[in-house]
Amino acid sequence: MALKLRRLSIFTAIFVLLCAAFVPQLYFACAHTRASALSEDCVAAAFNSQLAGESVKITAVMYHSVLKSKSGKYIVSPDTFENDLRIYRDRGYVSVLPSEIAAYARGEGDLPVKPLLITFDDGHYNNLYYAHALLEKYGMRALISPIGAFSEHSDSSGDDSNPNYSHLTWAQIGKMASSGVWEVGNHTYNMHAYKPRFGIARKAGESDAQYMQALRDDIGRMHEMLKVKSGVSVKTFAYPFGRYTPQSEKALKEMGYEITLTCNEGKTEVRRGSPDSAFYIKRYNRDGDRSADWLIKKLAL
């Protein structure tokens, strides 16, 4: 009997130590899923992760459209997207949101050792139609960065529910933000264009004051519309076409933005207690014509 009790005590001690080691990671990976969504996938990701130390490399992947009908540089199929999510899960990545990265850079909160930032640019309706359920299925979260003028058109035209070409309405953006799956970013109101300037690039002959005011007017307009029409306050900015300038970073910081996303490929080291390290986050564009092997190689870098 005494031997059995000693064995039971040893087993109990080991169990307690394991819980102490892994419960924080489990909470981090699963806290933002639905209460009933503590799936095997989520648990596996949590147990394959640890909390980061004083710095961590962010892996960010940029998506645009998700469509069954075709693929291309900015379009992936639902099957491809689901396979990507499986790849992330099986390699121990834990999805994080920009607000969590910014908090870590401020010296608050934690990040997993293998943080993954999944982003969707432009605000296509098919992100809600196809990607939302898949993110839920795998216990992952993502950023959606809509273009204001496109959402305004969807609202005014009523043509808001065709996955092939519709963009998200303000109400749909608000619904996604409140789901616990998505966080919302700013992708400008109407600067996602090649003319009169390429994205947010400075126009020829434009003075510093004129350029800064143009940025404040457009980005500020989108910021306010998201707040009023979608009920969200954003602190993440995704650069159209990946174009940025020293003045744009200054303007965004003055407006309270805490993280900016580029189209430069690679991973980004973010340092605890260094807010500036959350700017110029690099991202891999997920080209729908590229194989899963391409993604696996990028993750391994």
Predicted features along the sequence, with ranges:
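Aromatic- and acidic-residue-enriched segments that line the glycan-binding/catalytic groove
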Residues: 153-171, 203
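Acidic (Asp/Glu)-rich catalytic clusters
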Residues: 53, 133-139, 166-186, 253, ...
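C-terminal active-site subregion of NodB/CE4 polysaccharide deacetylases
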Residues: 26-119, 126, 193-301
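Hydrophobic alpha-helical membrane-insertion segments, chiefly the h-region
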Residues: 17-27
